[in-house]
C-alpha cells in the first residue's frame, strides 16, 4: 500500500504543477496580446522615422556622400572595423524555453567570429538571464542593466545609449550591433542582428518601406546638413534599441506561452501514465488480498 500512497502523492503533485503552468500560459497569452499591440504601434513610428531619414537624405543626394561629415554615417563597405560593441537583450526571467539560450548562443557565435578576424569585442548586456550567464562564465560585460527588457522604458534607453554613443563618437568602438530574439508570430521567434552604428548610407533601403497608404512625410531641413543628420541619428539609435526591447518582450511572452503549454500537456500525459500505474498497483493489491483470503479459507477446511 505504500506504493499506492506514493503514486497518489505524485499524481497530486503533478496536477498542482499542471494548474500552475496552465495559469502561467494564460498570463503569458494575455501579456502577449498587449505586447503585440505595442509592437505594432512602435513599428509604425519606426517606419515614419525611416521615412524622415529617406526624405532628408534624398534632399542631400546631389551633394555626394563624401560631403557628409557626420560621424554617425559611414560607407559600411569601406569602413575598417577593429572594435565592436555587442548589445544583447535577454529576459529577466526564465521558464521560456530556449528564448535566452538561443540569444546567448548567437552572441557567443558573433564574438568568436569577430575574434577570428582580430576584432576586439565588448559586450553590453540588457536582461538578468544573459548577464548572469556571462558573469558565471567569467566573460566581461561592460554595461549591465536588468529590469529593462521586461519593462521597456525610453528614458532608461536614452541613458543607456548615451554611453554607447559617447564611446562610438570618441573612437572607443567602430561598430555597434544589437542581438535579440525577435517576435515573428505567435509560435515563432527569430534571432535578429542589427547594426545601429555606424548608420550605413543605404540603411533606409534595408528596412521595410511604409505602405502606399501611409502618410507621406515632408520636411524642410533647417540648419546644417550634419546637424540635421546628427539629430536624426541620435533618435534613430535610441529608438532602434527601444524597438528591439519591445520586439524582444513580445517574443519572450510568445516563448513562455509555448513553454507553459508544452509543460501543461506533458503534465496531462504524466497524470495519465501515473493513473494507469496506480490502477494496476491497486488491482494487484486487490488480487493479492483475494488470493490470501482464499488461501486462508482453504487452510481452515
Swiss-Prot record:
It is found in: Cell inner membrane. CDD domains: F1-ATPase_gamma. It comes from the Bacteria. Keywords: ATP synthesis, Cell inner membrane, Cell membrane, CF(1), Hydrogen ion transport, Ion transport, Membrane, Transport. Gene3D superfamilies: 3.40.1380.10, ATP synthase, gamma subunit, helix hairpin domain. It is a peripheral membrane protein. GO terms for molecular function: ATP binding; proton-transporting ATP synthase activity, rotational mechanism. InterPro entries: ATP_synth_F1_ATPase_gsu (IPR035968), ATP_synth_F1_gsu (IPR000131). One of its GO terms (cellular component) is plasma membrane. One of its GO terms (biological process) is proton motive force-driven plasma membrane ATP synthesis. Signal peptide: none annotated. Produces ATP from ADP in the presence of a proton gradient across the membrane. The gamma chain is believed to be important in regulating ATPase activity and the flow of protons through the CF(0) complex. Belongs to the ATPase gamma chain family. HAMAP family: ATP_synth_gamma_bact. NCBIfam families: ATPsyn_F1gamma. F-type ATPases have 2 components, CF(1) - the catalytic core - and CF(0) - the membrane proton channel. CF(1) has five subunits: alpha(3), beta(3), gamma(1), delta(1), epsilon(1). CF(0) has three main subunits: a, b and c. This is ATP synthase gamma chain. It comes from Helicobacter pylori (strain ATCC 700392 / 26695) (Campylobacter pylori).
